[in-house]
Amino acid sequence: MQLVEKLNALCASRKLEKKIVDKIADNGVLITFCVFTLMAILIRFSVKDFESGDYIGSLALWYDHFKTHRGFAALRSPIGDYNVPYQFFIALMTYIKVKPLYLFKILSCIFDFLLAIYSGKFVYYISSERTGESRSLKDAISNLTFVLPYGVVLLLPTVVFNSALWGQCDAIYAFFIVLSLFLICRKSYFFSFVFLGCAFAFKLQTVFILPFFFYLYFREKNFSIFFLLFLPLVDILLSIPSLCMGLRFSKLVDVYINQSDAYHYVYMNYPSFWAMIGDNYDYLKPVAIIITLMILFVGLLYIVRKKVDLKSADNFLSVAVWSVWTCVLFLPSMHERYAYLAEILIVILFFMKLWSEDRKNLGRICVVACVLQLMTCIQYGRYLFQNSYMNFGMTLILHTSVYLFFSYKLFVNGFQKNDETIDEF
């Protein structure tokens, strides 16, 4: 009798086990989403007490300034070289009874998650255009086309290092730019430029994506060039709290001027093209700017004359990556964090190609994405951990070679033709 009872109990437990396994299998994608999210939180939490040189020498001092001068009241006399909207957040932090180091990192990590969500949503939107699937976020969470790019962006080494270790805020402007590009795809041009203005209000590095918007304008002509006026207008709107506290209007302009002239080095801990030439800032700065503009202009001529179809998801994202990467590689005074946007966009491009019917150049995109991550991780290691294991000259040669390889493949035989079957927005 006892044996029968044991067998019945064993059968019942196996049925329960099968139900659990089936449930896990049925919700595998949702569980993957939860695992990615939990891993991202735990990784960031594990390094919460790390203090970077930027935090010790800048962010902590700025926080003390706002704390000493009564929080929001200090907005009339901002400190440092960060944009006014970000300094509003610093003022807000002084009213929260939490360690300031944690507050800076929490703010950046919130935008890590927003950036990852819209990177995944970008890929999911492109895929759903082709397959006719639902585009709701609820459905996206149960779809690998959303979950994989979401998880990869969230766990990218440079994304984790930037916010959780460094305490920097590049995820903020990158999020607004990805959202802006997403809205361009949805033909919501007004809000696209509003969010582009939000990006510009937080970071001057937003200018790296502007050549791409000019390419879109001259090739597709779907929006007015006057939409670019949203960049200064949104900056002014987001600065209203500071202006109300007595901030002089000229300070809004001064912060951009100071940022553009803050570092008198042709290159800064980043394997840019000019590291091969030298570091005579006074002579090479104008040369670097002119050459960058020339390369971008040649790109514009090619795109217009060859009638490159920027409505193609492949072309759209490839040109966006190329324009940002060109700016970072050839402009003066670039350092390791400035390739952040290109690193995010090429991940989006990779996953878009992965779920496309045409996977041409998928391997090339994967290699380029990995090299970009590797280059930046090496330079992050130099700054954050004083790691000098990798020779700077080798990383410089590899970085420049991969850029030239990507450019050659893109402009010689990489663009999708108008008569090919492609994913269009």
Locate each region found by the language model.
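Start-transfer (signal-anchor) and selected internal transmembrane alpha helices
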Residues: 1-44, 110, 124-148, 312, ...
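Transmembrane helical bundles and short interhelical boundary loops of multi-pass, membrane-embedded
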Residues: 2-10, 47, 252-271, 320, ...
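Transmembrane signal-anchor helices characteristic of membrane glycosylation enzymes that use polyprenol
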Residues: 24-57, 109-112, 155-157, 161, ...
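Aromatic/glycine/proline-enriched transmembrane-helix motif characteristic
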Residues: 28, 40, 116, 125, ...
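Extracytoplasmic catalytic/substrate-binding loops of multi-pass membrane glycan-assembly enzymes
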Residues: 48-64, 77-89, 263-273
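Specific aromatic-rich, kink-prone transmembrane helix
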Residues: 118, 172-189, 345-349
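Membrane-interface alpha helices of multi-pass inner-membrane proteins
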Residues: 161, 177-183, 190-215, 323-330
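Perimembrane helix-loop-helix junctions
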Residues: 208-233, 341
